[in-house]
């Protein structure tokens, strides 16, 4: 069939761009015949494909991005990394990598989604040879959706247990406690014999009720990955409740998601402010904040500091997951995504920095109360959320109130990240379905199947060996290594294959002006260099996963982790090689064909220079001489 090329590629109408009663094109490129007038009805009485949704108001998009990108990592990981890597000095590599890596890629993904009006896979119709990036992001976000919700389930469990007069993790004597359990004490108490005449050396071997509640009651931790054990029925119910909540947040699309995030994205800030006010009034809070910010300039010479800064930026900005492109795809075509990206990046990093004051004011109080150095109580990740902070609130007046506030904030921080991640996955999935496969309740059923599948996989994490499985997912599947790999190839595809100047023109077409040239320079040079540099450092300084500094994973457990990582990382080269091998012609012809963009219907007004093409609408019949052939794939 004859093909008519536009200025920068060939046109393709994606399913969600067909308005009203329109249906997919027939095999000859013309609209397929239907039962309605002029053949425009759906064939055989099939349902019409609805137009792609857009945000009710632009603030819905802003709040959704805040809810997704600002998550648990901002509260429980950044403050610890800042303390561990030289205090205020850590802000130097953090800000530098944000400027040359985080913000440019953050903007790239949002603008790409807005321009292509597609989810994480079809967005790469801009450079079809690199569609493997879309499949890779779908794999990564699926892994994230699977294991991330476990933190919500644990947080929900702690929240329920907080509604008691005495917190269950504050005292010994419960069925899950061992004879080695000793309640919270000051370090000097052991020296003067006020704790049952035990010496400090003897007490060092005893266990806190907070740790025993976490390991023996919540996790019911087994001896290793090879001993899966039974399900924890209480945590399983909490997990099920979380998945039901996520389902009803996502099932109706961005119209419902955009409303829910107004609460889930803003209320955690209210709780953070309340906790900060409470924290700074506690004894020892100032010491904790000083430890958080105290500069250690020698740390700048350590490669690990730069690795930690880079991985934290890419993880907290939610880069490489495909969800940002999905959220951007629901924007109006002329939305100022450049301004939005800058604002969102500042909110993200600002939240991380602010959360450090909240966390370390509490940890400073905790260290003072126990008479130990703050390094003994500083934790990161689940250790902060479920050991350090629960221990701290037991020392406060009205402990259940502060525990309930903290875990409610934790639940909300994770909830919007979770359901927006699921939204990104579902968007990419539904964009793949041809228009002819559309059916009523397609979204609702797809979301239900996704949630059900993830729930079944999550059952492996509520067993006695569940924490070992959780750590495998966390350490390998969505690690800094996989996200840096994604970001590197995104820069290559857009800046070097499609063309950085060309994409800057596309952005100008949307927002009315070209962004700062810094973005183009970053996409072309600085960002890929930073990504590849930190990626290589990650590989060179790789350390096998160890749980709680004691349990070493078996070789097959580590192999499983690397399988998680490689299942996404190999999508890019395998798809690229597969396309080149299947295509026909010389290598130059294959490359030219496979890197030619496939435009959507909404690009006609902006991309086509031919008057016939510019005036084309799907409702207006055209002559054979001026017909534009619509193709669905470049393969």
UniProtKB/Swiss-Prot annotation:
Glycans are attached at residues 192, 197, 548. The modification Phosphoserine is found at residue 623. Keywords: Cell membrane, Glycoprotein, Ion transport, Membrane, Phosphoprotein, Sodium, Sodium transport, Symport, Transmembrane, Transmembrane helix, Transport. It comes from the Eukaryota. One of its GO terms (cellular component) is apical plasma membrane. Belongs to the sodium:neurotransmitter symporter (SNF) (TC 2.A.22) family. SLC6A8 subfamily. Its main location: membrane. It comes from Oryctolagus cuniculus (Rabbit). Creatine:sodium symporter which mediates the uptake of creatine. Plays an important role in supplying creatine to the brain via the blood-brain barrier. CDD domains: SLC6sbd_CT1. Prominent in kidney, heart, and muscle, also present in brain, but not in liver and intestine. GO terms for molecular function: creatine:sodium symporter activity; gamma-aminobutyric acid:sodium:chloride symporter activity. It is found in: Cell membrane; Apical cell membrane. The modification Phosphothreonine is found at residues 617, 620. InterPro entries: Na/ntran_symport, Na/ntran_symport_creatine, SNS_sf. Residues 1-35 are annotated as: Disordered. Glycosylated. It catalyses: creatine(out) + chloride(out) + 2 Na(+)(out) = creatine(in) + chloride(in) + 2 Na(+)(in). Residues 25-35 have a biased composition (Low complexity). It is a multi-pass membrane protein. The keyword Lipid metabolism does not apply. This is Sodium- and chloride-dependent creatine transporter 1.
